[in-house]
Amino acid sequence: MQYNRYMDFASKKCVPCQGGEDPLERQKVREYLKKLTSNWRAYDNYTKIKKEFKFSVFGQALEFVNEVGKLAEAEGHHPNIYLHSYNKVIIRLWTHKIGGLHENDFIMASKIDKIKPTE
């Protein structure tokens, strides 16, 4: 079995993107999306990914937002975060400096999926 270096995004650390790189191509985005464990979707012509999270109560949604914020600071890669309808959070990821998706976005998506609010 051949080892795929992209299989475990959550074990990786985001690396600073200085710009000047090309964004991931559509086929690579599709491949990377398959490696995530949940329902992340590409949009805006495969230049961004997003996912909506739903929680039982507002407090859980707010806790989740705060944990995503801590993760973003630790990784140096910051998603757009929208808390709406009291218990739903939309996370949108892309790398602003290259105007599209980078491996860092998938690393963040994988790590965000591991955040579980307390009951």
Give the location of each predicted region.
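Long, contiguous binding/interaction regions
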Residues: Q2-E119
